[in-house]
Regions:
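Acidic, glycine-rich active-site loops and adjacent beta-strand->loop/helix elements
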Residues: 75-78, 105-110
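C-terminal binding/interaction regions
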Residues: 3-5, 26, 32-45, 53, ...
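Two-metal-ion RNase H-like nuclease active-site motif
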Residues: 1-11
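Structural motif
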Residues: 1-3, 69-71, 99-103
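Ordered, amphipathic secondary-structure segments that act as subunit-interaction surfaces
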Residues: 52-83
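Short Gly/Thr/Asp-enriched flexible loops that form oxyanion-binding sites at enzyme active sites
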Residues: 78-95
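N-terminal nucleophile
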Residues: 90-93, 102-107
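Short beta-strand scaffold segments in enzyme catalytic cores
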Residues: 15-20
Length: 166
């Protein structure tokens, strides 16, 4: 089983959505988990995880974590070449380093070069940035690359983004 998370912020609330699916190339069959949390923390530059991690953990507490192959987050695992944790790294620690985390970021974070890999999909000239922990970066890259969809953002991750804003 694979889990993918995204959170959308509005007013003083956060809507976190998780898609649960079986195969990396899945495009239609998935289960949706959703939660809205009131009174979320303010965004602090460089400390995004402090805002989003509690939302993800709260929703994860409602999901059976047995047989989870990996978790995809919208963001970075590492923030620099010294492996300072981003959202994905902090999530990995919260899960006792038991479930691999793959970060899929839409925008570049310039202070990391060593532990990220740009992925061009479809005809896009703008890459996605892949980072990982608990799984080899090349393997994580290949898994995201194999996800269904002919465009830059894989079909299920596009659907996940849509559901957060619904």
């Amino acid at each position: 089983m694979i889990l993918a998370f995204d959170t959308y912020y509005f007013e003083n609330k956060a809507k976190t959505v998780c898609l649960e699916f079986e195969d990396w190339n899945e495009d239609k069959s998935f289960k949706v988990h959703t939660e809205i949390i009131d009174s979320v923390s303010e965004y602090i530059p460089g400390e995004f995880y402090k805002r989003e991690l509690p939302c993800i953990i709260s929703l994860l507490n409602q999901i059976d974590l047995k047989n989870i192959e990996a978790i995809i987050v919208d963001g970075f695992v590492y923030l620099d070449n010294y492996k300072k944790y981003g959202l994905g790294g902090h999530l990995y620690e919260k899960l006792n380093k038991e479930i691999p985390i793959i970060g899929v970021a839409k925008t570049n974070f310039a202070s990391i070069e060593k532990y990220k890999k740009p992925l061009l999909r479809g005809n896009s000239i703008k890459p996605l940035y892949i980072t990982s922990i608990g799984i080899d970066l090349e393997e994580a890259f290949q898994k995201v690359e194999s996800m269904a969809g002919e465009f830059r953002i894989p079909t299920l991750l596009k659907e996940l983004d849509r559901l957060t804003k619904e």
